[in-house]
Regions:
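Serine-hydrolase catalytic machinery in alpha/beta-hydrolase-like enzymes
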Residues: 6-104
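Conserved alpha/beta-hydrolase "nucleophile elbow" surrounding the catalytic nucleophile
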Residues: 26-28, 112-114, 163
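Short alpha-helix in the alpha/beta-hydrolase fold that links the catalytic acid
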Residues: 36-39, 170-180
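Alpha/beta-hydrolase fold nucleophile elbow
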Residues: 103-113
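Gly/Ala-rich beta-loop-alpha elbow adjacent to hydrolase catalytic centers
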Residues: 113-117, 121
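A conserved short beta-strand
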Residues: 130-142
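C-terminal catalytic histidine-bearing segment of alpha/beta-hydrolase fold enzymes
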Residues: 159, 175-218
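Short beta-strand/loop motif that positions the catalytic acidic residue
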Residues: 159-162, 166
């Protein structure tokens, strides 16, 4: 089966059965290969997990060798919202393909992403038919709180982490996301990483792994 998004796949080692999937979504201008680096540290602790790292559905407007989930070259909030909704639809189709291919349910799937990928994970995690196992997000935010609050259909629990010195996506968005999620009865844990800019430091990766291990049936 060919997926609708070009995907880097990391299979369980030693031919282990696939019981879980972690879908890793890259940031603006990145690609699936970039974000797949997380699997190098995680896979030995998650022996029955397949990692799927798709490229965004369109080339990045400012970095044509990379990809994006939605265009940021126009800073109009309504335009960004409309583009992100298009990406949501494509991701939901892609996730359904994964579920069919590997005989998985949402409860077997962790959504994880960095920056723009984190934003998409939050939206998909709250607008699906049933809860995913969890969302693990790095350095992201909620794209449009008013729009999202009006279409919540699921309440996937979340772990969100952010660098306190992030100069790309301000760390204030972590606190805003926590407040929004709690107000909408979504279980959330957060971790602010000291002296960290817009990347995924080892502390964030390790904390995220520990959270995933608590939630996935290994």
């Amino acid at each position: 089966m060919t997926f609708s998004l070009n995907t880097k796949i990391i299979y369980p080692e030693n031919g282990n059965d696939i019981k879980n999937a972690i879908i890793l979504l890259h940031g603006y201008g990145g690609d699936g290969n970039d974000i797949s680096a997380l699997s190098l540290n995680w896979k030995r602790f998650l022996p029955n997990t397949i990692f799927l790292c798709p490229n965004g559905h369109e080339p990045c407007s400012i970095n044509p060798v990379g990809f994006q989930w939605f265009d940021l070259s126009n800073d109009d909030s309504q335009y960004i919202l409309e583009e992100s909704i298009k990406a949501e639809k494509k991701l939901k189709l892609y996730i359904n393909e994964i579920k069919k291919k590997y005989s998985l349910e949402n409860s077997n799937i962790c959504l994880s992403g960095f920056s723009q990928g984190c934003m998409m994970c939050i939206n998909v995690g709250l607008t699906s038919d049933t809860d995913f196992n969890c969302v693990v997000g790095f350095s992201g935010k909620i794209i449009n709180k008013e729009n999202l609050s009006n279409k919540i259909t699921s309440r996937t629990k979340m772990f969100l982490t952010h660098g306190d010195r992030d100069t790309v996506v301000s760390s204030i968005h972590l606190l805003e996301a926590k407040e929004f999620l709690l107000r909408n009865n979504v279980e959330v844990e957060i971790k602010m990483i000291n002296n960290s800019d817009h990347h995924i430091p080892i502390e964030a990766s390790s904390s995220a792994l520990n959270y995933i291990k608590k939630n996935l049936i290994i």
